Amino acid sequence: LHRRAPTEAEAGALSALDIALWDIAGKHFGVPVYQLLGGKVRDRCRVYYHVFGETRKELVDGVKDAKAQGFTAVGHLTPFLDEERDVPYFKTHAEKITEAIDAVRLYREAVGNEVDLCIEVHRRLTPAEAVQLGLGIEKYHPYFFEDPVTPDNFDEMAYVADKINIPIATGERYTSLWEFEMALSRNAVQYVRPDVCLVGGISGSKKIAALAEARHVGVVPHNPLSPVSTAACLQIAACIPNFALQEYPIGEDRAPKSDMVTGIAQHDGQGYLVLSDRPGIGVELKPNAAKKAPMKPREVTTRLHADGSVVDQ
Protein backbone atom coordinates (compact mmCIF):
# COMPACT_ATOMS: atom_id res chain seq x y z
CA LEU A 1 0.00 0.00 0.00
CA HIS A 2 2.92 2.35 0.61
CA ARG A 3 4.28 2.21 -2.94
CA ARG A 4 1.16 1.77 -5.04
CA ALA A 5 -2.08 3.68 -5.44
CA PRO A 6 -4.69 1.92 -3.31
CA THR A 7 -8.29 1.43 -4.34
CA GLU A 8 -10.76 3.98 -3.02
CA ALA A 9 -11.91 1.49 -0.37
CA GLU A 10 -8.37 0.94 0.90
CA ALA A 11 -7.56 4.64 0.62
CA GLY A 12 -10.65 5.59 2.60
CA ALA A 13 -9.83 3.16 5.40
CA LEU A 14 -6.21 4.30 5.62
CA SER A 15 -7.27 7.94 5.57
CA ALA A 16 -9.71 7.40 8.43
CA LEU A 17 -6.98 5.77 10.50
CA ASP A 18 -4.58 8.63 9.80
CA ILE A 19 -7.13 11.28 10.81
CA ALA A 20 -7.95 9.36 13.98
CA LEU A 21 -4.29 9.03 14.95
CA TRP A 22 -3.66 12.76 14.48
CA ASP A 23 -6.77 13.49 16.53
CA ILE A 24 -5.57 11.20 19.33
CA ALA A 25 -2.11 12.80 19.29
CA GLY A 26 -3.52 16.30 19.45
CA LYS A 27 -5.80 15.43 22.34
CA HIS A 28 -2.96 13.67 24.14
CA PHE A 29 -0.83 16.82 24.01
CA GLY A 30 -3.78 19.16 24.48
CA VAL A 31 -3.21 21.10 21.25
CA PRO A 32 -4.91 21.40 17.86
CA VAL A 33 -3.46 19.17 15.16
CA TYR A 34 -2.31 22.22 13.22
CA GLN A 35 0.10 22.96 16.08
CA LEU A 36 1.66 19.53 15.60
CA LEU A 37 1.98 20.31 11.89
CA GLY A 38 4.04 23.44 12.50
CA GLY A 39 1.50 25.99 13.66
CA LYS A 40 -1.19 28.01 11.97
CA VAL A 41 -0.50 30.72 9.40
CA ARG A 42 -4.06 32.13 9.43
CA ASP A 43 -6.88 32.63 11.94
CA ARG A 44 -9.80 31.78 9.67
CA CYS A 45 -10.34 29.94 6.41
CA ARG A 46 -12.31 31.23 3.45
CA VAL A 47 -14.95 28.80 2.20
CA TYR A 48 -17.14 28.23 -0.81
CA TYR A 49 -20.72 27.30 -0.03
CA HIS A 50 -22.61 24.57 -1.85
CA VAL A 51 -25.42 25.58 -4.18
CA PHE A 52 -27.90 23.00 -5.45
CA GLY A 53 -31.01 23.21 -7.60
CA GLU A 54 -33.06 21.22 -10.07
CA THR A 55 -33.99 24.28 -12.11
CA ARG A 56 -32.05 27.28 -13.32
CA LYS A 57 -34.15 29.52 -11.06
CA GLU A 58 -33.35 27.39 -8.00
CA LEU A 59 -29.64 27.64 -8.75
CA VAL A 60 -29.79 31.41 -9.25
CA ASP A 61 -31.79 31.80 -6.03
CA GLY A 62 -29.24 29.60 -4.24
CA VAL A 63 -26.38 31.82 -5.36
CA LYS A 64 -28.26 34.90 -4.15
CA ASP A 65 -29.04 33.24 -0.81
CA ALA A 66 -25.39 32.33 -0.26
CA LYS A 67 -24.41 35.95 -0.84
CA ALA A 68 -27.10 37.12 1.60
CA GLN A 69 -25.61 34.81 4.25
CA GLY A 70 -22.24 36.48 3.81
CA PHE A 71 -20.45 33.89 1.68
CA THR A 72 -18.01 35.32 -0.86
CA ALA A 73 -17.64 32.16 -2.95
CA VAL A 74 -20.09 29.50 -4.10
CA GLY A 75 -19.38 26.11 -5.57
CA HIS A 76 -20.70 22.73 -6.59
CA LEU A 77 -22.24 25.08 -9.14
CA THR A 78 -23.04 23.34 -12.39
CA PRO A 79 -23.86 25.05 -15.69
CA PHE A 80 -25.85 21.96 -16.70
CA LEU A 81 -29.23 20.68 -15.60
CA ASP A 82 -29.66 16.92 -15.35
CA GLU A 83 -32.80 15.38 -16.76
CA GLU A 84 -34.69 12.67 -14.90
CA ARG A 85 -32.73 9.42 -14.71
CA ASP A 86 -35.33 7.55 -16.75
CA VAL A 87 -35.33 10.15 -19.54
CA PRO A 88 -32.68 9.47 -22.21
CA TYR A 89 -30.31 12.41 -22.56
CA PHE A 90 -30.08 14.32 -25.81
CA LYS A 91 -29.13 17.86 -26.69
CA THR A 92 -27.41 19.14 -29.76
CA HIS A 93 -23.87 20.36 -29.26
CA ALA A 94 -25.01 23.94 -29.81
CA GLU A 95 -27.81 23.60 -27.23
CA LYS A 96 -25.55 22.05 -24.61
CA ILE A 97 -22.78 24.64 -24.88
CA THR A 98 -24.89 27.78 -25.33
CA GLU A 99 -27.25 26.86 -22.48
CA ALA A 100 -24.29 26.22 -20.18
CA ILE A 101 -22.67 29.54 -21.07
CA ASP A 102 -25.96 31.34 -20.45
CA ALA A 103 -26.29 29.66 -17.05
CA VAL A 104 -22.93 31.03 -15.92
CA ARG A 105 -24.02 34.46 -17.16
CA LEU A 106 -27.13 34.26 -14.98
CA TYR A 107 -25.09 33.25 -11.92
CA ARG A 108 -22.70 36.17 -12.41
CA GLU A 109 -25.51 38.66 -12.95
CA ALA A 110 -27.23 37.40 -9.78
CA VAL A 111 -24.33 38.32 -7.47
CA GLY A 112 -22.10 40.68 -9.42
CA ASN A 113 -18.39 40.47 -8.78
CA GLU A 114 -18.79 40.26 -5.00
CA VAL A 115 -19.01 36.44 -5.06
CA ASP A 116 -16.57 34.03 -6.71
CA LEU A 117 -18.11 31.28 -8.85
CA CYS A 118 -16.55 27.82 -8.67
CA ILE A 119 -17.90 26.06 -11.76
CA GLU A 120 -18.27 22.28 -11.43
CA VAL A 121 -18.64 20.14 -14.56
CA HIS A 122 -18.40 16.66 -12.98
CA ARG A 123 -16.29 15.18 -15.80
CA ARG A 124 -19.10 15.29 -18.35
CA LEU A 125 -17.31 16.89 -21.34
CA THR A 126 -14.86 15.80 -23.99
CA PRO A 127 -11.65 17.86 -24.22
CA ALA A 128 -12.97 19.71 -27.28
CA GLU A 129 -16.26 20.51 -25.54
CA ALA A 130 -14.44 21.62 -22.40
CA VAL A 131 -12.32 24.07 -24.37
CA GLN A 132 -15.35 25.51 -26.14
CA LEU A 133 -17.28 25.94 -22.89
CA GLY A 134 -14.24 27.34 -21.10
CA LEU A 135 -13.71 29.96 -23.80
CA GLY A 136 -17.40 30.85 -23.61
CA ILE A 137 -17.43 31.52 -19.86
CA GLU A 138 -14.05 33.23 -19.51
CA LYS A 139 -15.65 36.68 -19.54
CA TYR A 140 -17.56 35.82 -16.34
CA HIS A 141 -14.27 35.19 -14.53
CA PRO A 142 -14.95 31.90 -12.70
CA TYR A 143 -12.66 31.21 -9.75
CA PHE A 144 -12.02 27.79 -11.25
CA PHE A 145 -13.33 25.25 -13.78
CA GLU A 146 -13.54 21.91 -11.97
CA ASP A 147 -13.13 18.50 -13.60
CA PRO A 148 -14.16 19.56 -17.11
CA VAL A 149 -12.98 16.15 -18.37
CA THR A 150 -12.35 12.82 -16.69
CA PRO A 151 -9.25 13.08 -14.48
CA ASP A 152 -7.72 9.79 -15.60
CA ASN A 153 -6.00 11.30 -18.66
CA PHE A 154 -3.52 13.88 -17.42
CA ASP A 155 -2.46 14.95 -20.90
CA GLU A 156 -6.02 15.79 -21.95
CA MET A 157 -6.59 17.82 -18.79
CA ALA A 158 -3.36 19.66 -19.59
CA TYR A 159 -4.63 20.27 -23.13
CA VAL A 160 -7.77 21.94 -21.77
CA ALA A 161 -5.78 23.99 -19.26
CA ASP A 162 -3.51 25.25 -22.03
CA LYS A 163 -6.37 26.34 -24.30
CA ILE A 164 -8.43 28.39 -21.83
CA ASN A 165 -7.80 31.25 -19.42
CA ILE A 166 -9.61 29.82 -16.40
CA PRO A 167 -7.80 27.91 -13.62
CA ILE A 168 -8.44 24.15 -13.68
CA ALA A 169 -9.31 22.42 -10.41
CA THR A 170 -9.05 18.64 -10.10
CA GLY A 171 -8.01 15.85 -7.77
CA GLU A 172 -11.07 14.82 -5.77
CA ARG A 173 -10.87 11.28 -7.17
CA TYR A 174 -7.13 10.84 -6.76
CA THR A 175 -5.90 8.56 -4.00
CA SER A 176 -2.15 9.05 -4.11
CA LEU A 177 0.60 11.63 -4.12
CA TRP A 178 1.83 10.31 -7.47
CA GLU A 179 -1.42 11.07 -9.29
CA PHE A 180 -1.16 14.69 -8.17
CA GLU A 181 2.46 14.76 -9.32
CA MET A 182 1.45 13.57 -12.79
CA ALA A 183 -1.14 16.35 -13.07
CA LEU A 184 1.16 19.02 -11.65
CA SER A 185 4.14 18.07 -13.80
CA ARG A 186 1.99 18.58 -16.92
CA ASN A 187 0.63 21.96 -15.78
CA ALA A 188 -2.82 20.35 -15.93
CA VAL A 189 -4.07 21.89 -12.69
CA GLN A 190 -3.99 25.28 -10.98
CA TYR A 191 -5.94 24.25 -7.87
CA VAL A 192 -5.44 20.76 -6.45
CA ARG A 193 -8.42 19.20 -4.69
CA PRO A 194 -7.18 16.50 -2.30
CA ASP A 195 -9.89 14.70 -0.34
CA VAL A 196 -8.61 14.20 3.20
CA CYS A 197 -10.75 11.06 3.39
CA LEU A 198 -9.11 9.50 0.31
CA VAL A 199 -5.49 10.66 -0.03
CA GLY A 200 -4.06 9.25 3.19
CA GLY A 201 -5.72 11.58 5.66
CA ILE A 202 -4.00 14.61 7.12
CA SER A 203 -0.54 13.18 6.43
CA GLY A 204 -1.24 12.60 2.75
CA SER A 205 -2.95 15.97 2.31
CA LYS A 206 0.01 17.81 3.83
CA LYS A 207 2.39 16.12 1.37
CA ILE A 208 0.18 17.03 -1.59
CA ALA A 209 -0.03 20.64 -0.42
CA ALA A 210 3.77 20.84 -0.27
CA LEU A 211 4.05 19.31 -3.74
CA ALA A 212 1.63 21.93 -5.08
CA GLU A 213 3.38 24.75 -3.22
CA ALA A 214 6.58 24.07 -5.17
CA ARG A 215 4.64 24.91 -8.35
CA HIS A 216 2.71 27.87 -6.90
CA VAL A 217 -0.53 25.90 -7.14
CA GLY A 218 -3.34 26.54 -4.66
CA VAL A 219 -5.11 23.96 -2.49
CA VAL A 220 -8.91 23.66 -2.34
CA PRO A 221 -9.65 20.58 -0.18
CA HIS A 222 -12.52 18.44 -1.43
CA ASN A 223 -15.08 18.05 1.34
CA PRO A 224 -18.63 16.85 0.62
CA LEU A 225 -19.08 14.68 3.71
CA SER A 226 -19.49 15.86 7.30
CA PRO A 227 -18.37 18.22 10.10
CA VAL A 228 -15.70 15.65 11.00
CA SER A 229 -14.25 15.83 7.50
CA THR A 230 -14.46 19.63 7.62
CA ALA A 231 -12.60 19.68 10.94
CA ALA A 232 -9.80 17.54 9.49
CA CYS A 233 -9.58 19.75 6.40
CA LEU A 234 -9.29 22.87 8.55
CA GLN A 235 -6.23 21.49 10.34
CA ILE A 236 -4.46 21.39 6.98
CA ALA A 237 -5.86 24.71 5.77
CA ALA A 238 -4.65 26.37 8.95
CA CYS A 239 -0.98 25.61 8.41
CA ILE A 240 -0.25 25.53 4.66
CA PRO A 241 0.76 28.73 2.87
CA ASN A 242 -0.94 27.83 -0.43
CA PHE A 243 -4.45 27.25 0.94
CA ALA A 244 -7.04 28.93 -1.31
CA LEU A 245 -10.60 27.88 -0.42
CA GLN A 246 -12.36 25.26 1.67
CA GLU A 247 -15.41 23.43 0.34
CA TYR A 248 -18.26 23.86 2.84
CA PRO A 249 -21.40 21.70 2.51
CA ILE A 250 -24.89 22.98 3.30
CA GLY A 251 -26.19 22.24 6.79
CA GLU A 252 -22.91 21.61 8.61
CA ASP A 253 -24.02 23.69 11.61
CA ARG A 254 -27.65 22.56 11.63
CA ALA A 255 -29.57 19.43 12.59
CA PRO A 256 -29.20 16.56 12.01
CA LYS A 257 -25.42 16.99 11.76
CA SER A 258 -25.22 19.34 14.74
CA ASP A 259 -27.10 16.76 16.81
CA MET A 260 -24.25 14.30 16.39
CA VAL A 261 -21.06 16.38 16.71
CA THR A 262 -19.76 19.02 19.12
CA GLY A 263 -17.19 21.67 18.23
CA ILE A 264 -18.46 22.21 14.69
CA ALA A 265 -16.67 25.04 12.88
CA GLN A 266 -18.72 28.23 12.75
CA HIS A 267 -19.27 30.57 9.82
CA ASP A 268 -18.43 34.14 10.81
CA GLY A 269 -20.94 35.73 8.45
CA GLN A 270 -18.17 37.03 6.20
CA GLY A 271 -17.40 33.91 4.19
CA TYR A 272 -14.90 32.34 6.60
CA LEU A 273 -14.82 29.51 9.13
CA VAL A 274 -13.09 30.49 12.36
CA LEU A 275 -10.30 28.12 13.38
CA SER A 276 -10.82 26.33 16.67
CA ASP A 277 -8.17 26.04 19.38
CA ARG A 278 -9.73 22.83 20.69
CA PRO A 279 -7.32 19.87 20.89
CA GLY A 280 -7.09 17.27 18.15
CA ILE A 281 -9.17 18.06 15.09
CA GLY A 282 -11.50 20.02 17.35
CA VAL A 283 -14.67 17.94 17.27
CA GLU A 284 -16.20 15.14 19.33
CA LEU A 285 -18.96 12.71 18.46
CA LYS A 286 -21.94 12.89 20.79
CA PRO A 287 -23.14 9.71 22.52
CA ASN A 288 -25.08 7.42 20.18
CA ALA A 289 -24.05 9.49 17.15
CA ALA A 290 -23.49 6.33 15.12
CA LYS A 291 -27.01 5.14 15.87
CA LYS A 292 -28.40 8.45 14.61
CA ALA A 293 -26.68 7.96 11.27
CA PRO A 294 -27.02 4.29 10.32
CA MET A 295 -25.68 3.06 7.02
CA LYS A 296 -28.16 3.54 4.21
CA PRO A 297 -27.86 1.65 0.93
CA ARG A 298 -27.37 3.95 -2.03
CA GLU A 299 -28.83 3.10 -5.38
CA VAL A 300 -26.29 3.27 -8.17
CA THR A 301 -27.88 4.62 -11.32
CA THR A 302 -26.73 5.90 -14.66
CA ARG A 303 -28.20 8.00 -17.42
CA LEU A 304 -28.59 6.83 -21.01
CA HIS A 305 -28.12 8.68 -24.27
CA ALA A 306 -31.03 8.81 -26.70
CA ASP A 307 -29.34 6.03 -28.70
CA GLY A 308 -29.27 3.71 -25.67
CA SER A 309 -25.58 4.02 -24.81
CA VAL A 310 -24.41 4.90 -21.30
CA VAL A 311 -23.58 8.50 -20.45
CA ASP A 312 -19.95 8.54 -19.29
CA GLN A 313 -20.17 10.84 -16.30
Predicted regions and their residues:
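Conserved, mostly hydrophobic/aromatic
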Residues: 17, 30, 74, 120, ...
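Ligand-binding pocket scaffold of soluble enzyme catalytic domains
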Residues: 28, 46, 50, 54-57, ...
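Proline-centered loop/turn at the N-terminus of a beta-strand
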Residues: 32, 46, 116, 167, ...
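Metal-dependent enolase-superfamily TIM-barrel catalytic cores that perform enediolate-based chemistry
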Residues: 44-45, 50-163
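N-terminal amphipathic alpha-helix/helix-capping segment at the start of soluble metabolic enzymes
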Residues: 26-27, 31-44, 265, 273
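Shared catalytic-loop signature of beta/alpha-barrel
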Residues: 4, 135, 141-144, 150-279
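Metal- or metallocofactor-binding catalytic centers and their adjacent structured scaffolds
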Residues: 1-29, 312-313
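Extended hydrophobic packing segments that form well-structured cores
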Residues: 281-313
